[in-house]
Amino acid sequence: MDLVVEPNLHSLINSSTHKWIFVGGKGGVGKTTSSCSIAIQMAQSQPHKQFLLISTDPAHNLSDAFGEKFGKDARRVTGMNNLSCMEIDPSAALKDMNDMAVSQANENGAQGDDGLGGLLQGGALAELTGSIPGIDEALSFMEVMKHIKNQEKGEGERYDTVIFDTAPTGHTLRFLQLPNTLSKLLEKFGEITGRLGPMLNSLAGAGNVDISTKLNQLKESVETIKDQFTNPDLTTFVCVCISEFLSLYETERLIQELISYDMDVNSIIVNQLLFADDDQEHNCKRCQARWKMQKKYLDQIDELYEDFHVVKMPLCAGEIRGLENLRKFSRFLNKEYNPAMDNKIIYELENKK
């Protein structure tokens, strides 16, 4: 008997094991709306758990989606007691990192204008690293490491599941490559510090700090993340696309890359569907023409990903902004949209100011 895969995310929304959920795809396909919707549905379905939604996209949209301001520190969504949001700000994170480096350098005996502390006082670290390609992804990765450390120590708010609203595909792939890249880099650093450790400690003004120990601790943290990201019970990736050629092509490329990283991926959200055959009241030649094109690519998606959860989401008449609109829209992730029965809901969003 053939395995029937449900066209919804019900199993993920009610999952008791997942710690990390990534939501990504091509730019402009509705990633933020989808990640917010997943987070809301999980929070509603599991009220005894705490959820965190993090934006790793430099063009942060979580504040716009919910209609309230979020920043670099996690803050509860108004109207929900078990869902928090945060937007990683690279410039603020770099400043914090620079200030921390100054403090540590001064504590370890590198005071003075000629020491490491003096070099960093003017924001040299932030200035140097701010222009490095991929710094946004690296800072996002550091945030993941911080959450793992805090949970291991029992510090701060404990989140059962973290949902990532990721940047467009290229940024996301660089982010997911970081565990492997850092692991290899730290191995090389380990070899160097094994030979030059005392000299490096002296240069850093950190005679009482064993650099090799610090590197080994960092390597252990990176390996922990690698293990968790490749465990399908703990981590999964939800692809988001629209039913057009370029989006379908990029989704396939993304899926192949994720498979090469040994990451679990078995869900696709297809957004902005017209379902024109079932909407005779609001129909036109242009709608029919676009729906015909969408159906062509939907058939290809169904054929290519027959063993995936393919969730088909409607194009709404208005913007999906604010908690109430997101709640209405997100219900179709848990129980698939029925054009004949649910048609009215997509027009209810039209009147939201």
Curated annotation (Swiss-Prot):
Keywords: ATP-binding, Cytoplasm, Endoplasmic reticulum, Golgi apparatus, Hydrolase, Metal-binding, Nucleotide-binding, Transport, Zinc. GO terms for biological process: tail-anchored membrane protein insertion into ER membrane. Disulfide bonds: none annotated. It is found in: Cytoplasm; Endoplasmic reticulum; Golgi apparatus. Pfam families: ArsA_ATPase (PF02374). GO terms for molecular function: ATP binding; ATP hydrolysis activity; metal ion binding. Zn(2+) binds at residues 284, 287. The keyword Nucleus does not apply. ATP binds at residues 26-33, 244, 271. Transmembrane segments: none annotated. It is an enzyme of class 3 (hydrolase). One of its GO terms (cellular component) is Golgi apparatus. Its main location: cytoplasm. The active site is at 57. InterPro entries: Anion-transp_ATPase-like_dom, ATPase_ArsA/GET3, ATPase_ArsA/GET3_euk, P-loop_NTPase. Its EC number is 3.6.-.-. HAMAP family: Asna1_Get3 (MF_03112). NCBIfam families: GET3_arsA_TRC40. PANTHER family: ARSENICAL PUMP-DRIVING ATPASE ARSENITE-TRANSLOCATING ATPASE (PTHR10803), ATPASE GET3 (PTHR10803:SF3). Belongs to the arsA ATPase family. Homodimer. Component of the Golgi to ER traffic (GET) complex, which is composed of GET1, GET2 and GET3. Within the complex, GET1 and GET2 form a heterotetramer which is stabilized by phosphatidylinositol binding and which binds to the GET3 homodimer. Interacts with the chloride channel protein GEF1. ATPase required for the post-translational delivery of tail-anchored (TA) proteins to the endoplasmic reticulum. Recognizes and selectively binds the transmembrane domain of TA proteins in the cytosol. This complex then targets to the endoplasmic reticulum by membrane-bound receptors GET1 and GET2, where the tail-anchored protein is released for insertion. This process is regulated by ATP binding and hydrolysis. ATP binding drives the homodimer towards the closed dimer state, facilitating recognition of newly synthesized TA membrane proteins. ATP hydrolysis is required for insertion. This is ATPase GET3. It comes from Zygosaccharomyces rouxii (strain ATCC 2623 / CBS 732 / NBRC 1130 / NCYC 568 / NRRL Y-229).
